[in-house]
């Protein structure tokens, strides 16, 4: 699946003198790898894990509700993308950029407000990085290099064992709907014995306190 579906659509980059460090979009996940050349020099390779042509949840063979995130799949097979190099370290990476824009101060009444907000959202994606999230520990020299490229101090680098983006949970819920045994039984609202049918609820409340639960 990786060789046929993912690898042809991947856009790998090796940072070097001829290839500057790419722009990393706010909140998107990238696979970062430390590569060793034949001359024992180290290079940083980067692959974007977001692709509109591929689903983020990949169903594993055998069914039974087993799925894998596409970024984990890319990270696992990343050595096949950078052939001719030795993989010395790898991790998923997410950059969080500053989103502090004063919309009121920047707004001009002569502009269309919808277009103005669209432009504002685009600007937010290009603002300065304030945080780097990693899924694995990486060599200190590599982390320092990432900090230097992104202009972030080392104390703003964090490692997380949890997925760097948990928005896939909603997609997972839809995929597993046929597995009813994984869900709680639907709760049916029940009438409260505190209230009498046929009488105004407000009048009953004025007569005495009522206790409800949900």
What is the meaning of each model-derived region?
Residues 1-214:
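N-terminal localization/anchoring segments of enzymes in phospholipid and broader phosphate metabolism
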């Amino acid at each position: 699946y990786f060789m046929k579906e993912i690898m042809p659509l991947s856009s790998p980059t090796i940072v070097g003198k001829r290839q500057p460090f790419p722009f990393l979009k706010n909140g998107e996940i990238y696979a970062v790898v430390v590569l060793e050349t034949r001359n024992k020099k180290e290079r940083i390779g980067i692959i974007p894990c977001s692709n509109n042509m591929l689903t983020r949840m990949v169903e594993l063979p055998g069914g039974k509700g087993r799925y894998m995130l596409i970024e984990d799949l890319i990270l696992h097979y990343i050595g096949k993308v950078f052939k001719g190099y030795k993989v010395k370290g790898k991790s998923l990476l997410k950059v969080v950029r500053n989103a502090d824009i004063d919309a009121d101060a920047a707004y001009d009444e002569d502009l269309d407000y919808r277009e103005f907000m669209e432009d504002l959202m685009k600007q937010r994606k290009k603002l300065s990085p304030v945080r780097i999230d990693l899924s694995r520990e990486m060599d200190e020299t590599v982390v320092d290099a990432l900090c230097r490229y992104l202009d972030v101090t080392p104390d703003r680098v964090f490692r997380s064992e949890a997925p760097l983006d948990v928005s896939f949970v909603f997609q997972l819920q839809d995929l597993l709907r046929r597995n009813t045994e994984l869900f709680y039984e639907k709760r049916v609202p029940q009438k409260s014995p505190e209230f009498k049918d046929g009488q105004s609820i407000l009048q009953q409340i004025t007569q005495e306190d009522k206790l409800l639960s949900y």
